[in-house]
Amino acid sequence: MLYENRVITKKEVKKILKGLENLKKEKFEKKSSSEDIHELIESLLIKRIGIDAGGKMHTARSRNDQVALDIRMKIRDDINIICQCLLDTIKSLVQLAKEHQETIVPLYTHLQQAQVGLFSHYLLAYADALFRDLDRLYVTYGRVNENPLGAGPIGGTSIQIDRQSTGKMLGLKGIVENSIDATTTRDSAVEYIAAIAILMTNLSRISKDFSIWSTSEFSFLQLSDEFSSPSSVMPQKKNPDILELTRGKTSHVIGNLTSMLSTIQGLPSGYSRDLQQINPSIWSASKITISALLVMESMLKSVIINKKNMKKAAEDGYLIALDLAEKLVHNGISFRKSHQIIGRLVKIAHKSGKPISELNKSEIKNEIKGKEVSLELLIKLIKSTTITSSLHDRTSQGSSGISEQKRMVKHRLGKINVYQTGIKKRSNDVQNSLNKMNKKVKALTK
């Protein structure tokens, strides 16, 4: 860019670029008197090509805008990696959902059985949450992928430069225009960590559910040995270590976000050395999130689902209660009155230790006295209502109804394809820009 704007000569740009290419092949000493990597590279370049040419490399730039650029480019790359890993995890969830569209399972509120549902419905719920994480990262990417370079230390420069051109060469879309804003703020980095903190929270919740469901008390699923560990003293144990570590690492990412906000909230305008303290939090959160997604995807592909235990748990409860109440509503009885009637039947069935379907005529009759409901109708509804029929009856959009599962699985698979195209294009756009820049470098160094 400096050469194109006639700030340096062709001879100088050739010496600088060749010198930098040679430095890429060298190993740097860990101990150096240089303050940071930028100063080290400049000092090494000057030693090799002289200060007349090497001393011009830093023209119209500052470490303040260089560091801001480096952080943005690193986050940009991490977002693309995380988006691909996240999409792969969503694929695993949706594929598992496709295989379990008729696998019956209890749905819980307050950790108490609430309604009968389908395992696919549960899996799609988390797929949808992760899709929103993907959306957040997509939006954040746009704010991250902007060029702060050329802002100088804080107030810009009198030297003729082209910030748009620099950004284009690096695959950045537009510039962070205000030079104070470009060098001072790190809100795009905070936004990124906030997005992956929410993402990790969703992974933690999946881990919690799977951890509970893998216990002998539930035995809804079994983790493969790859994602479990034995006890050192108890031979029967199979501990869900990976799920527990995912929960634990989520706390680290949330801590990283809190640390960054705590650092930034007290800073004045302009660059302060405090900003260096947030960088380890960014790198740590990225690394944890990528690892957690890779593990989650693999775990979902290998988990063994115990359909029989899931269905038995659903049959042993009173999960058709709401469905019975709604059938009374279909027959002209108010929902509140229906709720009271079925509630009484559940209570007597629970006391008797049997399902509602096994209540006899006299037991039902005693509980509906004065309720203005036909005994014959109620008995007919009880006999015809099962957990399976309930799932066929549910047709509201987004419900656990069997027909809705087929529609939602198909829709989510299509959504995955759209996102995959977008992620690939975004990565290709960056790589194409860098390739063009490298061609320019080669042409100038011939």
Task: Kindly give the residue locations of the regions a language model identified.
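A short structural micro-motif
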Residues: 18-26, 186, 344-349
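Short, well-ordered beta-strand elements within core beta-sheets of diverse protein domains
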Residues: 1-7, 74, 121, 190-198, ...
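A helix-coil-helix interface module used to build multimeric assemblies
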Residues: 1-156, 161-163, 167, 227-230, ...
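Leucine-rich amphipathic alpha-helices with coiled-coil/heptad-repeat character
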Residues: 27, 93, 97-100, 104, ...
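Helix N-cap/coil-helix junction residues
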Residues: 7-8, 172, 333, 354
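Charged, flexible cofactor/metal-binding loops and thiol motifs
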Residues: 71-72, 79, 83, 87, ...
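Short runs of predominantly hydrophobic/aromatic residues within well-ordered alpha helices
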Residues: 38, 42, 189-192, 321, ...
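Glycine-rich cofactor/substrate-binding loops
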Residues: 53, 234-446
